[in-house]
Amino acid sequence: MNRRGFLAATATTLAMPRIARSQQARILRFIPQVDLPLLDPVANSAYITRNHGFAVFDTLFGQDSTFAAQPQMVDGVATEADGLTWRLTLRDGLRFHDNTPVLARDCVASIARWGKRDAFGQALMAATNELSADGDKVIVFRLKRPFPLLPAALGKVASNMCAMMPERMAATDPFGIIAEAVGSGPFRYVASERVPGARTVYERFEGYVPRPSGTADWTSGPKIAHVDRVEWNVIPDAFTASAALRSGQADWWQEPALDLVPSLRKDANIRLIELDPTGAPAIMRFNHLQPPFNNPGVRRALLGAVDQAEFMEAVAGAERELWKAGTGYFPSSSTMASTAGMAALTSKRDMAKVKADLAAAGYNGERTVVMVATDLPALAALGLVGADMLKRAGMNVEVQATDWGSVIQRRASKEPVEKGGWSVFFTSFFGLDQFTPATHLGLRANGTAGWFGWCDSPKLEALREEWLRAPDLPAQQALAARIQEQAFTDVPYLPLGEYSIPTATRKEVTGVLKGLPLFWGVQKA
């Protein structure tokens, strides 16, 4: 079925009598922030793909609400030789959705693939001398040096997730894309019901065996699926999505438009939940490979143009409690946040000086292509304010409005703008993704091996390596301050402030876990 046919069928369904309450209670109808563009949570850092990933795939460790790693697929962990050897034993009963058993060699291949793509994974693999399977149940790391953050790396909630998949899938080029989704998680992806642009469906995997003890907390603990189906129905228009939630045609709206939050808060049938307590840092990401932002002087000049309050007001408007200005390269909720170098963002704004600094840096009217995702209200607001800021600074701006899925695909292009490339895009992060240099994609500065935008700074990379080896929290904080100061010199991106978008559910929906949209534990009355 194509998208137009699906929407017509949906309209007909909305006019039909409701089906039996007992049957409806087994179906969770979810409105995602955007459509699912890609199925591979290892090769793609988009949050919508990560959310899909945690439904379908499982991880060796989970992460709880204190940000600590907890065994998930792993039953036992043993360290030997002063922390240079780690032996991870898989628990019994693990099966993939094709009903084949999860074996240690599947996990070894999955870790190796992820380790080539993820920032934290790259650090772990750089410290690893050998990764192997000892029989069907035991994964063995032999390290070059101690890496006490190994469980945290394998169990991180931040993109890119270390998803366990069959060896045949994990053999795929990590810079390619896997076109199927066969995991071992509590839900299986129903490819036959996929309608691009409109619908994604998951069914409870009857072969899933949850952990036998503990409490579900973020991605740790028993993952018990109480619903038979989870249906993601894309509704781009915020008023239509709001109406669907209010009428009971939808159960859960992932990201309500912030201007509708006050009215939703007054609805007795709706519950607003702070899903992510770490906030959403917003950024303007540069393409460091192409003019004009391959020039660090041009990037530095624009720091003086950023008015974080202006960006945040565009996103959240009157909902002042939902945003913060005066934030740097680490979220305000992180122990790594500091005031180091912050005068670059908090001093008096002077656009005349910005223009002079751009000219002194050598900006000569180069075309600047600004990608703006119009189907996500927060990113659309960031993009429009950012494009206007660049124009007021005297830059030659071309706004290219598109959907987020297209931005995700196009940002991979390293071509100049004349050949379909780009100069700037806007996004926001799950705050936990930026909590430390270990997981902070935006602060990786390893050139073309890094995240989209491809910042290249040996100094930032060296400081990150120092941080990974820091012996305690005070040492980590001191290094994080130095990293932030260096970031204000290299300017991998512009920090635009941070905001929080509550998630909205019907009151009869219970058991929603904090952290990110997770579908185990959720029940409908």
Model-derived regions: residue spans:
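Extracytoplasmic/peripheral linker and loop segments enriched in polar/acidic and small residues
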Residues: 347, 398-413, 438-507
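Periplasmic-binding protein-like
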Residues: 289, 293-334, 381-382, 487-495
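N-terminal lobe/hinge region of extracytoplasmic solute-binding protein
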Residues: 31-81, 112, 182
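Ligand/substrate-recognition segments at binding pockets and active sites
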Residues: 198, 237-240, 256, 355-428, ...
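Long beta-strand-rich cores associated with HINT superfamily self-processing modules
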Residues: 503-525
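Surface-exposed binding/hinge segments that line
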Residues: 89, 123-195
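Structural transition elements
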Residues: 187, 321-360, 376-381
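Ligand-site clamp/hinge motif
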Residues: 210-263, 396
